[in-house]
Curated annotation (Swiss-Prot):
Belongs to the class-II aminoacyl-tRNA synthetase family. ProS type 1 subfamily. Pfam families: HGTP_anticodon, tRNA-synt_2b, tRNA_edit. It comes from Thermosipho africanus (strain TCF52B). It is an enzyme of class 6 (ligase). Its EC number is 6.1.1.15. One of its GO terms (biological process) is prolyl-tRNA aminoacylation. It catalyses: tRNA(Pro) + L-proline + ATP = L-prolyl-tRNA(Pro) + AMP + diphosphate. Homodimer. Its main location: cytoplasm. Keywords: Aminoacyl-tRNA synthetase, ATP-binding, Cytoplasm, Ligase, Nucleotide-binding, Protein biosynthesis. The keyword ATP-binding applies. This is Proline--tRNA ligase. InterPro entries: aa-tRNA-synt_IIb, aa-tRNA-synth_II, aa-tRNA-synth_II/BPL/LPL, Anticodon-bd, Anticodon-bd_dom_sf, Pro-tRNA-ligase_IIa, Pro-tRNA-synth_IIa_bac-type, Pro-tRNA-Synthase_IIa_type1.
């Protein structure tokens, strides 16, 4: 490719809406352009990198025997209604009606469709196991699309699905995908971790995430020297609960004008934050639920959804709370809340004389005690585990790092085959539900994650495996330099090197800045050193070296880098 013909409009300033490095750099370097919130056009440089990412993923899928298909993006509502997820999936599902008033969705995932696909095709245990995958566009109506391609409404994803006649067979295939995903990370060149994760809206009973480390990541990875690693959405709390042994005090209802947050309540009443109980109200398919957690801990929404078995669960709106309870947010509490289902974290069992909302505007209860003042019948682990909490395996303090989820694999079991009544005949002639697994990888998200992990003040630092072009020939000089550069360009093309030549009529400074901004892994400068029989070769982010202006030696130097 000639830079003079390349469509890669670069920008000298960060876009005003860019929140993180990848969002800024991918736009500045001419990889993407924003069309609407969470919707992007991928320009030629981005397409080249995306195709290289896709090919790495495709090669690793093919190696483990997965077969590529392509399913439609638009899916009929009946499939999702049959599985029970039409209402459960939540507002992230983009729904639409056709001209005949039939309901459809722009697929956020394809479990229902692929299960329906094999209904009349896989009939016998002799045909199993089977793994199918696709690379396609998906849609999720994110409430706040942000961070560029890391959380977009429209994105490119690889999703795979496996069908089995036994859990042992699923375990084997699950491990194949787990190993393949690690190889994908390694081939791309990312620092990563494999962690235990929540199953979320997909369902199932076991899952793992593949997380690329990045300071701006939204995933919190907790890990231990013993080898344990997990998402903070999943890690169970195994710490000791601080037990209050003081005598019960008389319940008081205290006037607390305009005091709503835990911090405000603690300051106003002069009590430690740990002596406050947060009362959070959610709305799901079975109505309202009040969740109770100690004031010094955060509620783990994924744990609550998993406990309730309700992925449609959402935080109740202020208007809904006022209508249902007659109390504004900030003054809710369990005392007197007899008609709502209450689920509490284990830590509250050991608290005495604590503070809760007074179920009346501008009031809180002081010296509240369990059983005497209210009852809880449902107890579970509801808190977010933090850095320093005990490892659930060995008990040592957990460490933490932020990351970006790129891959997620699930053991689905019979969740979808049961709900959609899709069966096969086993070796005894009995009809049984397929045991399933599913395996997702964010292709376009990987584009952003690489930039988040690999960049500096000058621009992107692409690994050679996924760079849009591996080698950039920068022509600095007149006829002799141009003539040599053209010969070198043709030679490298013939040798299969992914090369671009910067033949633009612009200053050397502009060429060097664009090379660093775009992030070409290797830059060859053909300039004044050519008179001495040398060219300059520089790896991105490293010092330049001089190499003899000999085609074969230049190629050897490239291959050794």
């Amino acid at each position: 490719m000639r830079f003079s013909r390349l469509y890669a409009p670069t920008l000298r300033e960060d876009p005003s809406d860019a929140e993180i490095p990848s969002q800024a750099l991918l736009q500045r370097a001419g990889f993407i352009r924003k069309i609407a919130a969470g919707v992007y056009t991928y320009l030629p440089l981005a397409r080249r990198t995306l195709l290289k990412i896709e090919n790495i993923v495709r090669e690793e899928m093919d190696k483990i025997g997965a077969q590529e298909i392509l399913m439609p993006i638009i899916q009929p509502a009946e499939l999702w209604q049959r599985s029970g997820r039409w209402d459960d999936y939540g507002p992230e599902m983009m729904k639409l009606k056709d001209r005949h008033n039939r309901d459809f969705t722009l697929g956020p995932t394809h479990e229902e469709l692929v299960t329906e696909l094999i209904r009349n095709e896989l009939n016998s245990y002799k045909q199993l196991p089977v793994s199918l995958y696709q690379i396609t566009t998906k849609f999720r109506d994110e409430i706040r699309p942000r961070f560029g391609v890391l959380r977009a409404r429209e994105f490119i994803m690889k999703d795979a699905y496996s069908f089995h006649d036994s859990w042992e067979s699923l375990d084997e295939t699950y491990q194949l995908f787990k190993d393949a995903y690690s190889k994908i990370m390694e081939r791309i060149g990312l620092r990563y971790s494999v962690i235990e994760a929540a199953t979320g809206a997909i369902g199932g009973n076991e899952s793992h995430e593949f997380v690329a480390f990045a300071n701006t990541g939204e995933s919190n990875v907790l890990y231990c020297d013993c080898g344990y690693a997990g998402s903070d959405e999943r890690v169970p709390y195994k710490g000791d609960y601080e037990k209050d042994d003081e005598a019960e005090k008389t319940l008081e209802k205290v006037y607390t004008p305009n005091v709503r947050t835990v911090e405000q309540v603690a300051e106003f009443l002069n009590v430690p934050i740990r002596k406050i109980v947060k009362s959070l109200v959610f709305k799901g398919r079975d109505g309202f639920v009040m969740a109770l957690v100690p004031g010094d801990r955060e509620l783990n929404f994924e744990k609550l959804k998993a406990y309730l078995g309700d992925q449609s669960l959402q935080m109740a709106e202020a208007e809904e709370i006022l209508e249902e309870f007659g109390v504004p947010i900030g003054f809710l509490g369990p005392v007197g809340a007899d008609k709502v289902r209450i689920v509490a974290d284990y830590g509250i069992k050991y608290m005495k004389n604590f503070v809760v909302g007074g179920m009346e505007k501008d009031y809180h209860y002081l010296n509240v005690n369990l059983d005497r003042d209210f009852k809880v019948n449902e107890w579970t682990d509801l808190v977010v585990v933090q850095i320093g909490d005990p490892c659930p395996v060995c008990g040592k303090p957990l460490k933490g790092e932020k990351g970006i989820e790129l891959g997620h694999i699930f053991k689905l079991g019979t969740k979808y085959s049961d709900s959609m009544d899709v069966k096969y005949m086993d070796k005894d002639g009995k009809m049984k539900s397929f045991i399933m697994g599913c395996y997702g990888w964010g292709i376009s998200r990987t584009l952003g994650a690489i930039v988040e992990q690999l960049h500096d003040d000058d621009g992107i630092i692409w690994p050679r495996s996924v760079a849009p072009y591996e080698v950039d020939i920068v022509v600095v000089g007149k006829e002799k330099e141009k003539e040599f550069s053209e010969k070198l360009y043709s030679y490298l093309l013939d040798k299969g090197v992914d090369v671009i030549i910067d033949d633009r009529n612009v200053s050397p400074g502009v060429k060097f800045k664009d090379a660093d901004l775009i992030g070409f892994p290797i830059r060859i400068t053909v300039g004044r050193k050519l008179k001495e029989g040398k060219v300059e070769i520089k790896e991105r982010g490293k010092e330049a070296i001089l190499v003899d202006a000999n085609m074969e030696q230049i190629l050897n130097a490239i291959n050794e880098m």
